[in-house]
Amino acid sequence: MAYETYQKVIGSIQNISRGTSCCSFLMAVQTETETINFVVTGETLVIDNIRLRRGMRVAAFYDTSLPAPAIYPPQYQAELVTVLRQNQNVTLDYFDRNLVSEDNSLKLNLSPTTRISTLNGQRFSCNPGDEELLVYYTNTT
């Protein structure tokens, strides 16, 4: 996964409509400042295979290196979509062996109850350091 070119958008699903093919749909996400449309296809990774619905708070990642139409509201191909709980955040980044994100904005503090799994939901029992990780977190002081 070429996460380096992925951009995250967090917001609430305002609308879901039929796409241009039988295997796609258009998801309108309202952020704090604007509406952004995402094309969701069979190639889009939806974490935990959750059925996306209007009103859900989501994080959608799109690849900034792909072409996008110059339209308003903006429209991107969703590469990854995940549902977020209230006050939950998510990041997709490389974490070093000390579990510090590549941009030094996040340090992971794992506990025995920390759930670590692969993209297909299998338990991951190895050290997650030196890996690209999708990390869910809440702010702590």
Q: Language-model features: where?
A:
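Short, flexible, surface-exposed loop segments at domain boundaries
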Residues: 1-26, 47-109, 119-141
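Homeobox/homeodomain signature
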Residues: 3, 28-30, 42
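Glycine-centered tight beta-turn/hairpin loop motif at sheet-sheet or coil-to-beta transitions
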Residues: 31-35, 103-105
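A cross-kingdom feature marking solvent-exposed beta-strand/loop segments within repeated
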Residues: 34-50, 113-122
